[in-house]
């Protein structure tokens, strides 16, 4: 392109035309009646003679055009980092996979370049872009979104190649620069099989679609947009400075699945390559020329691209910490300044007149540097780059403006300088900028990388403002608030890809949320919790400033709602689209423009009212809420609806919504050039995690593609809809324009698009919950209602419904693993199903903990299903009326539904499932597998299938009937109750089938022979062997009913005629073992009875107090085990008599004894006291006497004969005497034979109860044990000047002289008497006594017994005595 003509984009010709430089600033004077009245001069001739194909980018017609657009803008499936992307043709056939590299980031290409097409410049450094040298015509360009405008202030053309560098007025904050290949211009560097594995391009020239027959179809671009695709491996020419690809054959697989070729309209657009060595995408070229035969790129080399920036730097400033602060002075008239440190002076250059490019960049090194501004600095386009920590301050409120600040990684710059009105401080770089100025800073901030800490200081009047506005973009930056008053929160916005606002433990109140996309983050990373308050409000006129733009004759881009002025007609128009055509061609198109007349003030007022109207629409926030904070959402002005389609990650946070509506939803996938809509099929999932969502008179929707984890508390008429179809979309989504919400309805059509909820819901005070999609958790409802339509609802926590309804709608499926409790009747509608199970074991697949569910009743609709299995226990009556419902009890799979807990196994009585309640379902079926059903009232069924199960009818005082048309039973038990004239009855009317079934009979009074009671009635001719009489243990006997079969004219009947009763030795043994447990407690006390007197013989002293603690365990027959802790305290006194030392004393005792066996477990607590005397003769003989009384509190649980838990009291008396003689073998060694006799009195106990209708009793009378013991102890004493230690060991034999009472057991078969048995055992002990002072003694003894039916396994006895 020469200097006389420039390429201009023609909206009329839908392409570029050559336009004289003299026409660049065309203005139309005079009053225009309409756009059609304009005469276009010679430019029109150029348009007419223009040949479209010569300026085209052409793509494959077999693939959706949208795919090429999404590719170029990183939208749809082509998000940054995506891999293995499938490419489909228009018929849905897979035509290729982008699997050679992850998807690159194309955001470094321009989104808008004035009248030039997008994508013709590429940012490769924070302030520099590269393009083709022949690309001219616009100095304005934007990145990320078209609103983010930058101005070209300088450029550098290559002297021989078609490439140039352009400098921008500011550092770009919205996007990250593209990385430049380090390979550069090397012949063959980009050929197939080399280091670079994939080549992608994009551009915004005129677009064409080409079919396999070579036919071209133009695509109307409405202002230009980007497309992109794959390029084949490249060959080099011109000494490697140029690369080319034969891309004309776009149907050749060698060119990739998204092959396309470019022409002049895409000049300057970038070519990216994936460097397999460095594992990254790099910029390798810019388009210079092309045709259908191939494209040619100028290789982007680091040498050239770094050439111009080097010219834009003044000398690097190196701070010397020994020379004081750097003094910065500046002359705004000359645009020249200095930074000096003592005698060292560095020159700097700033804006000169209107020339921003005169401003040079400055680099700073030297750690902990200090800079003081003596003058306000206007550095033009020059920026500051810090490689070390610095403090920058002003002498007297001087300001700084320029291209921006770069802080390198690990660097912290303390910035104490304010900015100026209408200027933004641009900040990038991974390091930190700490803003610490004073007073009110009128400048704004745009940050795109690293960290900015806002710590502005107040002025003398207490006023402070870190910035007038803040924009966070590119997704790489974080702004941290040191306090809540650093900036007006409503002046914070998040631009392209957003960034993080860290509340830093502060409480912040927003009335506006300005977030462009999902990259916007509000977080708190401080250990102190923050509160984010949203009091969102509609705009008011004072908040709105309207910029009146001048209409560009050659067309252009804008944002819907922008106000334009057409001077030729003195008319104001509001733009309704994102672009407009040239030469006033579409001013009459009401889809593009709204004519608002000739009055400027009125036009501005209309714009304001439109913006206010849009802001009153339901609110949306596309961003993220993260960290340690609560969110409080107040009633919102306008329409009180807030939709979050970003994400929430507040594991310890509470979100509160008062009135209005809150919606969590997924996000519709953004496609290039398309407005998102509720009706589109592709949505992105979003995660919402919080501790709790609290609703007060509010409505909450969890809509499609939203996954929520956290509890919900809903009160005061709140409504919760989990799986809602209500959604909102933003018609400006992906454009950077203000949110404009649109309400819609969208139902997920795949499981992956459905909502998922995990948590517990609390409903109070007339609130409601609708579970429509995936639910895992629990529900507590009080005076509220719950309905389920989901086919995947799981209660893994308790479901409790107090004065509340639970309704399963048509087709719903609910599984409750932790029980359901309600005082209302549950309703299960047509084709709905409810499954009740136990709690699955985490570590043992197939194992469950039993869980009980209790309801007032369950009503089943047509073809509804109720299943109780895998340790599920249901207590409820069930009605199905005339519905053909199905009830499944138990599970036949032997590998699941088990429990390894004996307690739980007893609850379930060994079955997989239990139902307690009657069923009224004349048209319904019940299937039982390894299940127990107890119908205590009448039940009626169409069909009953039972396998390895048990059916129990009736309850004491009430006989029940089970009426069933068809009964198919195998290996099952039917238990009925009977007296001598009546019984529960099973009535089979149509069909009886099965085998190996057992009839058990519980009786309500003493069984009598000669009865004649019908138990089962079946159709005539039924197999008499279907049932047989079974034996069951009742009380202490095995009872077998006598049943005969009778055939009548109409039926076969099983008739009860009597019983056979045989004593059950095992049951009797269990009972007597329990009754005998009192003796074992008595024996424990006996063994501890005379310990104190034995101590006296080893440590004679005067009067004193003592304490003793003993702990031991014992075991006996039938699995009996006990462990006890015994405590004694007492005092005694020595009386010296003639030839004898007599000790007398008193003691108090407490024993905590835990005992268990295979059939019982419990605790006995004993409290008592006694007196004792011990006489020690000078000859060595001694005697011991003791008497003691104990009161016992007993509580035991017995799992035999339905006895259950029993609490009772008892008491015992002890009288003991021991004599012995201590023979001294030497002065310190002795042997002591001894003999002891203990007589006692133990109170009896009595129990009366019923087991399966049988009256039982179990009692023993008071009895009087007499226990003897003989033995011998040996001991030796060791002593020093102030201490004495005595050690001893003993061996003895303990035996019963009298039998231990009598136990009487009584059941329907009569009384059974069991005499107590004598027992004996060997005793062994070792011990020691230590005298550490004249008045203190310590003792320790270990004891064990053997060879008895009951033995002490181990016992340890520790004592302490203090002499007065």
Curated annotation (Swiss-Prot):
InterPro entries named among the record's database cross-references: Autotransporte_beta, Autotransporte_beta_dom_sf, Autotransporter_pectin_lyase_C, Bact_Autotransporter_VF, OM_autotransptr_brl_dom, Pectin_lyase_fold/virulence, Peptidase_S1_PA, Peptidase_S6
Activity regulation summary: Inhibited by phenylmethylsulfonyl fluoride.
GO CC term, one of those recorded: cell surface
Biological process annotations from GO: proteolysis
Gene3D superfamilies: 2.160.20.20, 2.40.10.120, Autotransporter beta-domain
Active-site residues, record numbering mapped to chain: 134 (charge relay system), 162 (charge relay system), 267 (charge relay system)
Recorded GO MF terms: serine-type endopeptidase activity
Domain of life (superkingdom): Bacteria
EC numbers on record: 3.4.21.-
NCBIfam families: autotrans_barl (TIGR01414)
Domain notes: The signal peptide, cleaved at the inner membrane, guides the autotransporter protein to the periplasmic space. Then, insertion of the C-terminal translocator domain in the outer membrane forms a hydrophilic pore for the translocation of the passenger domain to the bacterial cell surface, with subsequent cleavage.
Protein name in UniProt: Serine protease EatA
Highest classification ranks of the organism: Bacteria, Pseudomonadati, Pseudomonadota, Gammaproteobacteria, Enterobacterales
Gene name in the database record: eatA
